[in-house]
């Protein structure tokens, strides 16, 4: 029987670096998490995962089966380097090929949701043409995802093009496809001039997962929990009252810390205490 508790996961980059997924999932289980989100970023090392052999893919599936800790989602931030909105046709083609490989990888290993980075371009200057190319690239990507039955979910970003649920919903309506949904980050959402609770309510019915982190205006990474502007309890209450029952993912970048597991455990306890106050989980 499926558990009725709220699934709580941890981002791969919060845990010690390395390519042994059995070790990573065992550690996540020890720390009390239900799942781990894989990162495929713009580095060559993580991009190489999309070219894993059949045996390497099966090893990940086996690690999930052995530990009971799932890998249901992928954070695909590689499109910073190879953006779908690039005016360089070769770069854009690489971006689409990365998308194709990511969808195939997800299909092979059981990943259900690929979180997309909402950048038309990242290292270049955006303009009307980059946005048009980005829209067309999303359409092509969602067509691929539909055939594979893999959900593409747009993150709410540290970038003006996609810094609110309202803006992401515009793309959802434009694409009008059940395999394109939203994956908001309550930290990014709170760092901009948004009515955060109204935005969360507006996204209900399209939100497939939620990133949990703290932020400050203009500071989107590595803000310790409790030191930023995010009203976690209100966000959790709003999501619960709106009927959201999906997963929450603690997003951290502690893989190079002296003791990543201790950092993660501290963050886990802090977040779960706010979840308990909001009635999402039972108090410890």
Swiss-Prot record:
Enzyme class: isomerase
EC identifiers of the protein: 5.1.3.22
GO biological process: L-ascorbic acid catabolic process
Expression induction: Induced by L-ascorbate. Repressed by UlaR.
Keywords of the record: Isomerase
Pfam family, any one: AP_endonuc_2
InterPro entries: L-Ru-5P_3-Epase, L-Ru-5P_3-Epase_Enterobacteria, Sugar_Epim/Isomerase, Xyl_isomerase-like_sf, Xyl_isomerase-like_TIM-brl
Reactions that this protein is recorded to catalyse: L-ribulose 5-phosphate = L-xylulose 5-phosphate
SUPFAM superfamilies: Xylose isomerase-like
Coiled coil: none
Molecular function terms, GO-annotated: intramolecular oxidoreductase activity, interconverting aldoses and ketoses; L-ribulose-5-phosphate 3-epimerase activity
Pathway the protein acts in: Cofactor degradation; L-ascorbate degradation; D-xylulose 5-phosphate from L-ascorbate: step 3/4
The family this protein is said to belong to: Belongs to the L-ribulose-5-phosphate 3-epimerase family.
HAMAP family reported in the protein's UniProt record: UlaE (MF_01951)
Main function: Catalyzes the isomerization of L-xylulose-5-phosphate to L-ribulose-5-phosphate. Is involved in the anaerobic L-ascorbate utilization.
Entry-linked NCBIfam families: hxl6Piso_put, PRK13209.1, PRK13210.1
Identification of the protein by name: L-ribulose-5-phosphate 3-epimerase UlaE
């Amino acid at each position: 029987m499926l558990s009725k508790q709220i699934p709580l996961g941890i981002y791969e980059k919060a845990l010690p670096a390395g390519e042994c997924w059995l070790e990573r999932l065992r550690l996540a289980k020890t720390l009390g998490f239900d799942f781990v989100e894989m990162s495929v970023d713009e580095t060559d090392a993580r991009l190489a995962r999309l070219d894993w052999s059949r045996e390497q893919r099966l090893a990940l599936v086996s690690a999930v089966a052995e530990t009971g800790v799932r890998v249901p989602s992928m954070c695909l931030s590689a499109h910073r380097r190879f953006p779908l909105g690039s005016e360089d046709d070769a770069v854009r083609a690489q971006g689409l090929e990365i998308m194709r490989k990511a969808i195939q990888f997800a299909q092979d290993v059981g990943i259900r949701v690929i979180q997309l980075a909402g950048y038309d371009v990242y290292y270049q200057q955006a303009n009307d043409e980059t946005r048009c190319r980005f829209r067309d690239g999303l359409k092509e990507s969602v067509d691929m995802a539909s055939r594979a039955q893999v959900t593409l979910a747009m993150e709410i970003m540290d970038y003006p093009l996609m810094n609110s649920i309202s803006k992401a919903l515009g793309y959802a309506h434009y694409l009008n496809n059940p395999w394109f949904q939203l994956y908001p980050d309550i930290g990014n959402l709170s760092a901009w001039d948004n009515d955060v609770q109204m935005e969360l309510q507006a996204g209900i019915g399209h939100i497939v997962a939620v990133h949990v982190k703290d932020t400050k205006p203009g500071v989107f990474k590595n803000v310790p929990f409790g030191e930023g502007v995010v009203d976690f309890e209100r966000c959790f209450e709003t999501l619960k009252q709106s009927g959201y029952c999906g997963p929450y993912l603690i997003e951290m970048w502690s893989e190079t810390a002296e003791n990543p597991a201790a950092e993660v455990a501290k963050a886990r306890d802090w977040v779960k205490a706010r979840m308990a106050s909001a009635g999402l989980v039972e108090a410890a």
